[in-house]
Swiss-Prot record:
<dbReference type="InterPro" id="IPR016174">
    <property type="entry name" value="Di-haem_cyt_TM"/>
</dbReference>
<feature type="transmembrane region" description="Helical">
    <location>
        <begin position="176"/>
        <end position="196"/>
    </location>
</feature>
<feature type="transmembrane region" description="Helical">
    <location>
        <begin position="75"/>
        <end position="96"/>
    </location>
</feature>
<dbReference type="GO" id="GO:0006122">
    <property type="term" value="P:mitochondrial electron transport, ubiquinol to cytochrome c"/>
</dbReference>
<feature type="binding site" description="axial binding residue">
    <location>
        <position position="194"/>
    </location>
    <ligand>
        <name>heme b b566</name>
    </ligand>
</feature>
<keyword id="KW-0813">Transport</keyword>
<protein>
    <recommendedName>
        <fullName>Cytochrome b</fullName>
    </recommendedName>
</protein>
<feature type="binding site" description="axial binding residue">
    <location>
        <position position="95"/>
    </location>
    <ligand>
        <name>heme b b566</name>
    </ligand>
</feature>
<dbReference type="GO" id="GO:0046872">
    <property type="term" value="F:metal ion binding"/>
</dbReference>
<comment type="subunit">
    <text>The cytochrome bc1 complex contains 3 respiratory subunits (MT-CYB, CYC1 and UQCRFS1), 2 core proteins (UQCRC1 and UQCRC2) and probably 6 low-molecular weight proteins.</text>
</comment>
<keyword id="KW-0812">Transmembrane</keyword>
<keyword id="KW-0679">Respiratory chain</keyword>
<keyword id="KW-0830">Ubiquinone</keyword>
<comment type="function">
    <text>Component of the ubiquinol-cytochrome c reductase complex (complex III or cytochrome b-c1 complex) that is part of the mitochondrial respiratory chain. The b-c1 complex mediates electron transfer from ubiquinol to cytochrome c. Contributes to the generation of a proton gradient across the mitochondrial membrane that is then used for ATP synthesis.</text>
</comment>
<keyword id="KW-0496">Mitochondrion</keyword>
<keyword id="KW-0408">Iron</keyword>
<keyword id="KW-1133">Transmembrane helix</keyword>
Length: 214
């Protein structure tokens, strides 16, 4: 049964009884759920892309072209993976901004797990950006990994170890693909921990009132 009284003062979803939460939660609390949808979409499309991708510097770009041109609905998978990656970051930055604005960093365990999630996501995105091994991919792999050389004493050794040689080459692409494949599963694990830690104490809300106010 829908109560049509004072409709203008009620959230659209609450009005339709579709969102079983208190009235003190606003739209800004929706981005965590959107991030989970992005994560599921990225994992699924990434799996189908990985089936057809070849982690070799001579074949990587051709394999991406093959996916978009020859694989049935490959262009859909590739575009969904690329576009929802951008959407992922849009949602996470809004999610973080909401947390900063409402002081949710006071819940330290949830906040620190979220920060770890952000860093892991950024690493995953970087490794994925390199995979097509086009001109910009090669440039990104060279420039970003070269930042490690700024570390005193250990920098050059770490960079050589990461590259698998003395320049960004085939071993670099192979390990970047392996890292890009495994990191989403770490993100899923961290997301589970993030959600469990959140539900241990509950979230804050715009009014700062008791979440069971209704």
């Amino acid at each position: 049964y829908i109560n049509y009284k004072n409709m203008s003062n009620q959230h659209t979803l609450l009005m339709s009884n579709l969102l079983p939460v208190g009235s003190n939660i606003s739209t800004w609390w929706n981005f965590g759920s959107m991030l989970l949808i992005c994560l599921m979409l990225q994992t699924l499309t990434g799996f189908f892309l990985a089936i057809h991708y070849t982690a070799n510097i001579n074949l990587a770009f051709s394999s991406v072209v093959h996916i978009t041109r020859d694989v049935p609905y490959g262009w859909t998978m590739q575009n969904l993976h690329a576009i929802s990656a951008s959407l992922f970051f849009i949602c996470i930055y809004i999610h973080i901004a909401r947390g900063l604005y409402y002081g949710l960093y006071m819940n330290k365990e949830v906040w620190l797990s979220g920060v770890t999630l952000l860093f892991t996501l950024m690493a995953t995105a970087f490794f994925g950006y390199v995979l097509p091994w086009g001109q910009m991919s090669f440039w990104a792999a060279t420039v970003i990994t070269n930042l490690l050389t700024a570390i005193p004493y250990l920098g050059t050794m770490l960079t050589t170890w990461l590259w698998g040689g003395f320049s960004x080459n085939d071993p670099t692409l192979t390990r970047f693909f392996a890292l890009h494949f495994i990191l989403p599963f770490i993100i899923i694990s961290l997301s589970s921990a993030h959600i469990m830690l959140l539900h241990a104490e509950g979230s804050n809300n715009p009014l700062g009132t008791n979440s069971d106010i209704d």
